[in-house]
C-alpha cells in the first residue's frame, strides 16, 4: 500500500506544492519505522477509498482512546470532481463518532478544507533543543533563520 500512497501524494496538490508528508525529505524514518510501530500498537491507522480495487484517496490518522488525529490525507486529482478526500474524511469522522471519540483533531495546517469543519483552533509552538557547543550554537542560529523565513 505504501507505493499506492506515495503515487497518490506525488500527483496530488500536496505533492505539486511540496506539502506532502510521504514524499518529503526525512519521511523515510517516519513511514518505515515509526508508523508501523504505532499501527501495531493501535495508535495509528491508514484508511483508503477505493474504486474498482484501486486506491484513489488515503488518510493517515493518530488514534488514542476517545481521540482521532487527522494527520494526513491525499487523493488522485483525476477524481477531484467527486471529492474523494472529503468523502473519506467525512466517513472517518462518522466512524470515529460511532466508536465513541469525543475529539476529532485536524492537527497541523490551517487549510481551508479543515476550517470548514473545525469548531476551534489551538496555538502551536515549535521547540528546538541544541547542545551547548559550537555546533549547537550554529544549529540554534540556523533554526532562527528558518523560523523567520517560515513566518514570512
For each predicted feature, which ranges?
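Active-site/acyl-donor-binding loops of N-acyltransferases
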Residues: 51, 65, 101-152
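Conserved acetyl-CoA-binding loop-helix of GNAT-fold acetyltransferases
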Residues: 81-94
Amino acid at each position: 500500500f505504501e507505493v499506492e500512497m506515495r503515487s497518490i501524494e506525488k500527483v496530488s496538490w500536496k505533492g505539486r506544492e511540496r506539502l506532502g508528508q510521504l514524499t518529503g525529505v526525512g519521511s523515510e524514518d517516519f513511514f518505515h519505522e515509526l508508523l508501523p510501530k504505532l499501527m501495531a500498537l493501535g495508535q495509528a491507522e491508514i484508511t483508503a477509498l477505493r474504486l474498482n480495487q484501486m486506491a484513489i484517496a488515503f488518510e493517515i490518522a493518530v488514534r488514542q482512546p476517545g481521540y482521532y488525529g487527522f494527520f494526513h490525507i491525499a487523493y488522485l486529482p483525476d477524481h477531484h470532481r467527486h471529492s474523494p478526500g472529503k468523502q473519506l474524511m467525512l466517513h472517518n469522522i462518522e466512524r470515529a463518532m460511532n466508536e465513541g471519540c469525543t475529539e476529532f483533531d485536524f492537527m497541523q495546517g490551517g487549510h481551508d478544507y479543515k476550517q470548514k469543519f473545525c469548531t476551534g483552533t489551538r496555538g502551536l509552538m515549535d521547540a528546538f533543543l541544541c547542545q551547548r557547543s559550537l555546533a549547537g550554537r550554529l544549529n540554534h542560529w540556523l533554526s532562527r533563520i528558518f523560523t523567520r523565513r517560515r513566518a514570512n
